[in-house]
């Protein structure tokens, strides 16, 4: 079960990183999905950091489980 969550987290993390604009304008400038550009960038940054932390935590947990 954790393997599936880890895989989905990795895919979502790749997607979140790919939609970041290198000029720090973000996803919201192209499509006003979140209402404002600043809000879109903040939401995307928070989601990306959450996915990074979740991915690393799951990696450590799965690594520990496979050792024993």
Curated annotation (Swiss-Prot):
Segments passing through the bilayer: 1-21, 44-64
Gene Ontology process terms (BP): protein secretion
Subcellular location: Plastid, Chloroplast thylakoid membrane
Domain of life of the organism encoding this protein: Eukaryota
Keywords, sorted A to Z: Chloroplast, Membrane, Plastid, Protein transport, Thylakoid, Translocation, Transmembrane, Transmembrane helix, Transport
Membrane-related topology note: Multi-pass membrane protein
One GO MF term attached to the UniProt entry: protein-transporting ATPase activity
Major subcellular site: plastid
InterPro entries the record matches: SecG
Single GO cellular component term: chloroplast thylakoid membrane
Keyword check for S-adenosyl-L-methionine: no
Entry-linked Pfam families: SecG
Function: Involved in protein export. Participates in an early event of protein translocation across the chloroplast thylakoid membrane (Potential).
UniProt-listed NCBIfam families: secG
Family affiliation: Belongs to the SecG family.
This protein's name: Probable protein-export membrane protein secG
Naturally occurring in which organism (per UniProt): Guillardia theta (Cryptophyte)
Upper lineage: Eukaryota, Cryptophyceae, Pyrenomonadales, Geminigeraceae, Guillardia
């Amino acid at each position: 079960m954790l393997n599936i969550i880890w895989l989905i987290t990795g895919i979502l993390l790749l997607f979140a990183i790919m939609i970041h604009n290198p000029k720090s304008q973000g996803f919201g400038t192209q499509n006003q999905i979140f209402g404002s550009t600043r809000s879109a960038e903040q939401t995307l940054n928070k989601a990306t950091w959450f996915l990074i932390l979740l991915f690393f935590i799951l990696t450590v947990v799965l690594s520990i489980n496979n050792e024993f």
